[in-house]
Curated annotation (Swiss-Prot):
Gene Ontology molecular function: fatty acyl-CoA hydrolase activity; N-acyltransferase activity
Pfam family, any one: BAAT_C
Cellular localisation: Peroxisome
Main location class: other
Gene Ontology terms: cellular component: peroxisome
Gene: Acnat2
Protein name: Acyl-coenzyme A amino acid N-acyltransferase 2
Length: 418
């Protein structure tokens, strides 16, 4: 009897799944597909074609995909290569506490490459991908000006505390924070515009707001002293790096594909005002899909005005730069290299860079679907993020391990629990 087996069928979203088809005729060509809908009913799909071995089995841990959305041996390729049916959609789990992403795996005993040809699958399996582990708690935060959601691991603590910042997407994005909490960190997913009573659009980087958030987190009884970490991406990584430079509360910072200077919006902190460098919009390029490529608009070669460059040498903690070498939003490797060079020129060894060939801009937790481009509501156009799906997927797996290792090394003190 034909069977499609996925184990575990119920797991955290950052855990791998083993997929096997059994009971096939020897050398049978098959199609395996993955399908999922987000909370807005947007459909995402992937497929790959395989040949059964002499025992009538296809084990994705060993079998090489002959074609489809990827080729070669990629056990989680169906998850990483999920693509939106409607162009420029990004798969983001909103409700991370109450429901999983339900991914349907289907097995067909032929090559099914035309969407218009509908035949019933020979076997199916539902895989539930959760974003919060057992015992993780979520607290809605409205404290002073601070708006966000705090995720706490099970247990008494104290736990190493982290602030999680996303970029120009705005609002409150929680899936990374909840997964980190499932791994033993207390994480504040922090909104800073386009959420509740916060500014509807980003007009300035108010570092006093982020210091208020850091103080709130450190004052929480379940947060380990004396300092916190920051994980940040894109525009959030610009803010994260500024926090590392100016806030003594921050002792470990992860910057994912962010600039090393202040761009587009002024940075304000107490009496300090840093006027931004302006994006060179005349350098925007358009991909064949119509998505806008901003990579050349943030040219670090033109960063000749020292006050606009973030003074990384002032950072009291450690900084981990994670960069995708095929990032099409900005030249993130060049920016990280500039920051590393500046640290070295001041005799500092507190920075480290992980560069991933083939990875794009949106480096997220493992097995998150690769997003090459998606709609930007502020621009009113799709943004190009770049990357190769398989190389990007490998970067997500490796960087997630390194991020956790980095925070454990630099946030855990005697008496802390993880």
């Amino acid at each position: 009897m034909l069977q499609l087996i996925a184990t575990p069928s119920n797991a955290l979203a950052d855990e791998p799944v083993s997929i096997r088809a059994i009971g096939l005729p020897p050398s049978q060509i098959v199609t395996i597909t993955a399908t999922v809908k987000d909370e807005k009913e947007n459909l995402f799909q992937s497929k790959a074609f395989y040949k059964a071995n002499e025992a009538g089995e296809v084990d994705l841990e060993q079998a090489s995909a002959l074609g489809g959305d990827y080729v070669g041996v990629h056990p989680m390729g169906l998850f990483c290569c999920l693509k939106p049916k409607r162009a420029f959609q990004r798969l983001i789990k909103k409700d991370v506490m109450n429901s999983p992403l339900c991914i349907c795996l289907d097995l067909y005993d032929s090559v099914c490459w035309l969407e218009t040809v509908r035949i019933p699958p020979k076997a199916s399996q539902i895989v539930h991908r959760w974003f919060a582990g057992p015992g993780v708690k979520r607290e809605q935060i409205r404290e002073g000006r601070v708006r966000g959601a705090l995720f706490l691991p099970p247990g008494k603590g104290p736990f190493p505390g982290i602030i999680d910042l996303f970029g120009s997407i705005g609002g409150l994005v929680e899936f990374r924070a909840s997964l980190l909490a499932s791994r033993g960190f207390a994480v504040l997913a922090l909104a800073y515009f386009a959420y509740e009573d916060l500014p509807k659009v980003l007009l300035e980087e108010d570092l006093d707001y982020f210091e208020e958030a850091a103080n709130f987190l450190l004052a929480h009884p379940k947060i380990q002293q004396p300092g916190i970490g920051v994980i940040s991406v894109s525009k959030g990584a610009e803010i994260g790096l500024a926090m590392a430079c100016y806030l003594k509360q921050v002792v470990a910072t992860v910057c994912i594909n962010g600039p090393s200077a202040i761009f587009d919006f002024p940075l304000k902190y107490r009496d300090l005002v840093v006027t931004p460098m302006r994006l060179a919009f005349e350098k925007i390029q358009f991909h064949g899909s119509g998505a806008a490529c901003f990579r050349h608009c943030w040219d670090p070669q033109n960063m000749l005005n020292p006050p606009k460059i973030l003074p990384v040498e002032k950072a009291q903690g450690k900084i981990l730069f994670i960069v995708g070498e095929n990032d099409q939003c900005l030249a993130s490797k060049l920016h990280a290299q500039r920051a590393m060079d500046r640290l070295r020129s001041h005799g500092r060894s507190s920075g480290r860079m992980l560069a991933y060939p083939g990875a794009g801009h949106l480096i997220e937790p493992p097995y998150s679907p690769f997003c090459f481009a998606c709609w930007d509501s502020v621009l009113g156009k799709p943004m190009l993020w770049g990357g190769d799906p398989i190389a990007h997927a490998a970067a997500q797996v490796h960087s997630w391990r390194e991020i956790q290792k980095f925070f454990r090394q630099h946030l855990l003190q005697s008496g802390g629990k993880l």
